[in-house]
Amino acid sequence: MACIRSPYLPFSVSPRHIAQNPNHANPDMNDTFGRIYLTHDLPGTGGHIKEQPEDFVVQEIPLYDFSDQGNFALLLLKKVNLSTLDFVACIRKHLHLRDEEVGLAGWKDKRAITSQWVSVPRENISESRLDRLTGEGIKILQIRHHSNKLRTGHLLGNHFTILIRQADAEAENRAQAIIQQLQTFGLPNFYGPQRFGARGDNPEKGLALLLGQYRLRSVRKRKLLVSSYNSLLFNLTLKERMKKDLFAKLLQGDIAKKHDTGGIFLVSDPEKEQPRADRLEISATGPIWGKKMKRAGNKAAALEEKILSSQGVTPDVFRKQPGSRRSLRIALKEVNVCQEKEGLRLEFFLPKGSYATVLLDEIMKA
């Protein structure tokens, strides 16, 4: 079948696929990454974020301590107003590395001040190379060593300090009310807008890669784009459950996740397990499609497969992807809220893979 050039994207897309799925040609990400509020009955604070990089500070928390022995150097690096891809490019350039030699536990926001650990081969570290690296808007905070490379997911989570400027006069009270409700029912675990790219076109590129209609040399970028399409499908699944009042309810055949240990299990008796969900001990999960994903059953499977079918794809498209399950909710812990002269300041921790912008959407509704 012949392919046409998408008017929005620099790659070819099947005309049949666009005809079946017109949203793929220009996905409306405002309708997919979280513009549905669990706390819709509570007024938001309004305001603006990220007016300055220092308004959005992120500190990565490692999953484990480092042994200070081994063939990998672990660099705690601080970056300012730098995307993760540009950040990695700087490291590669000045430490003379291939892309796959740079290990990251997670991706970070661009317009922010972020600190995160990066692993590189120990043999590539020298004082002169590190000096050149620090001239690129990057600061080295600490150097340690370990026996293995950092990989995606090797973090406990992130600590955030965020300033909301020009918020409503009642912002502090409004934020507290919203946070209390989210702590009771859980925070929707949507993927945030940064997952989908500045133009919102990463999911379409990811789909084209899956369909063999787009090629990309960089392994890191390929993984990012394919993951973005899977993230969109997860968001659609979560939104559908919220619309049907199934956000905090368990369905027959759900794959539930334990918040304390991360273990997953099949829900065969929803009524029996629901009290644990009400206490936020467990939550239903959504699909991250791939060969290792544990498939839901019964009613839960029907809902997930309906979303997939609505996009014109089948599970076979993801046969080469790893796959997993992602909790629909986050058990939100303590959030510190303080009204300051500059605005409303929030401090909180989120587990790995969760997005501060989703919490801010609920609080600000701006």
Regions found by a protein language model. Name each.
Residues F11-A366:
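Non-catalytic, substrate/partner-engaging modules appended to enzymatic cores
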